[in-house]
Amino acid sequence: MEYKNTLLMPKTEFPMRGNLPKREPAMQEKWAEMNIYEKVQEHTKGRPLFVLHDGPPYANGDIHMGHALNKVLKDFIVRYKSMTGFCAPYVPGWDTHGLPIEQALTNKGVKRKEMTVAEFRKLCAEYAYEQVERQREQFKRLGVRADWDNPYITLEPAYEAQQIKVFGDMAKKGYIYKGQKPVYWSPTSESALAEAEIEYQDKKSASIYVAFPVKDGKNVLEGDEKYIIWTTTPWTLPANLGISVHPELEYAIVKVNDEKYIIASELFETVAKTLEWENAEVVKTVKGSELEYTVAKHPFYDRDSLVMLGDHVTTDAGTGCVHTAPGHGEDDFIVGKKYGLEVLCPVDDKGVLTEEAPGFEGLFYDKANKPITEKLEEVGALLKLTFITHSYPHDWRTKKPIIFRATAQWFASIEAFRKELLEAVAETKWVPAWGETRLHNMVRDRGDWCISRQRAWGVPIPVFYAENGDPIITDETINHVADLFREHGSNVWFEREAKDLLPEGFTHPGSPNGEFRKETDIMDVWFDSGSSHQAVLEERDDLQRPADLYLEGSDQYRGWFNSSLSTAVAVTGKAPYKGVLSHGFVLDGEGRKMSKSIGNIVVPKKIMDQLGGDILRLWVSSVDYQSDVRISDDILKQVAEVYRKIRNTFRFLLGNLDDFKPSENTVAVAELREVDRYMLVKLNDLITKVKEAYETYDFAAVYHAIHNFCTIDLSSFYLDFAKDILYIEGANHEDRRAIQTVLYDVLVALTKLVTPILPHTADEVWPYIPGVTEESVQLTDMPEAVQLDGAEALKTKWDAFMTLRDDVLKALEVARNEKVIGKSLNASITLYPTAEMKAMLESINEDLKQLFIVSEYKLGGMMEEAPADAPKYEHTAVVVAQATGETCERCWVVSETIGKDAEHETLCERCATVVKENYVK
């Protein structure tokens, strides 16, 4: 008889190799055929809603690792919520207006100047839709479950109409105004920018100290002094109209040779050192407030520079006397306005100096620095020129420096509802907690929001102008424009004349002849995405406002979190979200930012093509995503190893349940052995721990808990000793069915627990599980932890056994290395434990030699009675010897009962009995 044919070896068609790059697309096709998103929504209908609102990625180019991290994190949460008593719809969105799309078309050779704005915008829309399609397929490949057929797209007419309504509501409340103010201006984009469109990079700039002679000392100064200012933007000097000093600071008149200079007293030493003054002495001090209304002369133009008081003046750098150009700085503008100065801005849209800067007209602002500095030297006003590298604002799209420039723009007055914004921030739950401080400080300190852009591709600002120049924004005009946009899209604004965009028969006192013109600026794209709470959450039947959660990268505190909060509080008085969760950026394995120049860019597509989407998802679950995270081939190799461990665990469980029918073979908990019940206690601990981790969005804790359970609790212990029973005993042996009962519970629970993270693998495992009826594991709920009677005592006892078992394993390892035994089944062990451990061992009814995977087990005396040469460990001394007897051909246990049964001479007594009872006809 071939005894190997009498072994119940694992049997399953579940493949050992994942082959995910091929298998996942097939699984996704299956999901599409069964309409998995709709099925889950149907299955969870009527449950409380949990709405995670998708911050729209920008529709341009392939998805990158930041997109993958973001979408997968969202998918974890939505999938988990739909398995824990919620209906969790997930509507993906795209942000589709803005400069990058205009640039992409120009780069493709579109001749923009040869077509109308409306024609150009049509091309922009076509391009945006192509990009949406491209990204949609890539997000689906990640295994993200969403309403992919019904996303929200910011260029769609229904969305634009709601955005117009948001603008109209804000205007009605008096929050929208037009004003000339210095704004961030990008000469390369030829448009105003919002704070969220700015990034800081190092820039080399001239650093100059300039003397402004006093013209009128107002009886405080003698008239022969000179104010010293410091600036890193010499090109703004043609726009200088004043000097700001701090009212509370003390200023010193410093005599240096024949000159007298005015600087802040506390900066005397620093300035003296920088300007290399020798024998400088302070001849007089005055308070800043006394210098108000004294007048200096512009160094190279025949005009005055008024001395004014400003709280923005500091002594962190410079001289305490601040060059003030109301057309080129926010503080300058505020102070200048207070003192009635004009807003002089001699720089055009392209960043070129105009005729209002005589002598420098036609020069690009950055190129004007040198001739202006030379002019200062020529007139004897330049005291020092050096160069510094400092952090300077750049256009986040073109990566070129920007300037402050006063222009006529549309603003949303944050000041008008700042208090409500701060209250809304305080009422929101922030994860990580520092998010609250970050947004609170931004809201507290931010100026009014410049919402107009001088571009073509965006939502028009729905304002008309009367013949006398009055802007027209009324309920009637707003509603009419919203209706037009809903019907025709926003391109209608560029296709029709102003009068054809107004309600029929519309009149206005400022237009006696019935003539009107329309605004040509468009809205900031942050106003687009920031209106999604109205256009999506409020408008769609399957969603609700406020959303339960917004989840984006930490750059969105100044972006989408901020703009959404501003528009929602302005319109509804409340935040659009109950909670906000943020994640860090994806860096390479060495912690460097990914860039083309370094050549360290990791793309999601490559990972999915080589390893699979579930490996990428498992990586997302493994990282501390609330900080910046790292990815590299080595890191992915480690993650793939963990995946293999989890997959092999599933395969082992399935293989050993091939002949198990849950309805017939399940053993009641009360009839299980202690070790089996202990395994169920460990499973319940896992369920509790994993669900708590999902609840707190701690996916790394889920990853580690599942990995440890598969490796330590199952592979290294339970499954290891269970093989002897599963393979060797007869199919219906009570111990075998007991173990299968536990394995079945473990398999079902484990499959569900990994579903949010590894949906492809979980749904691949699911149909192989005996007795399941659901079409997909996604249509089930998370397992519930069952409280077993006496669980705590059981856990205490068997945890103690596990620590003692570790001592035994160490001793067996030593014996193997010393060639006392080959493998552990060759061993006979005698234990000399501590009193506590001895009592514990004596209370165990299970076969201890099976639990230790040895052929013979003896309990000797106490630890102190152990032979002197026996290795001693924390809980026991262990004597390892070669077991006596021969090796059984069937179970490989060394036994003295081999051959006792004449019909089965090579088998031990146990195997002979099993064979006779189960396999001999």
Swiss-Prot record:
Q: What is an example of a GO molecular function annotated in this UniProt entry?
A: isoleucine-tRNA ligase activity
What EC number(s) does this enzyme carry? 6.1.1.5
Motif 'KMSKS' region extends across 593-597
According to the UniProt entry, where does the motif 'HIGH' region sit in this chain? 57-67
| Catalyzed reaction equations | tRNA(Ile) + L-isoleucine + ATP = L-isoleucyl-tRNA(Ile) + AMP + diphosphate
Coiled coil residues, start to end: none
How cofactor binds (record note)?
Binds 1 zinc ion per subunit.
Residues recorded as binding Zn(2+), renumbered to this chain, are 888, 891, 908, 911
GO-annotated cellular components:
cytosol
General function of this protein:
Catalyzes the attachment of isoleucine to tRNA(Ile). As IleRS can inadvertently accommodate and process structurally similar amino acids such as valine, to avoid such errors it has two additional distinct tRNA(Ile)-dependent editing activities. One activity is designated as 'pretransfer' editing and involves the hydrolysis of activated Val-AMP. The other activity is designated 'posttransfer' editing and involves deacylation of mischarged Val-tRNA(Ile).
Quoted from the entry, the domain comment is: IleRS has two distinct active sites: one for aminoacylation and one for editing. The misactivated valine is translocated from the active site to the editing site, which sterically excludes the correctly activated isoleucine. The single editing site contains two valyl binding pockets, one specific for each substrate (Val-AMP or Val-tRNA(Ile)).
Q: Which PANTHER family match?
A: ISOLEUCINE--TRNA LIGASE, MITOCHONDRIAL (PTHR42765:SF1), SOLEUCYL-TRNA SYNTHETASE (PTHR42765)
Protein name, per record: Isoleucine--tRNA ligase 1
Q: Which organism is it from?
A: Bacillus cereus (strain ATCC 10987 / NRS 248)
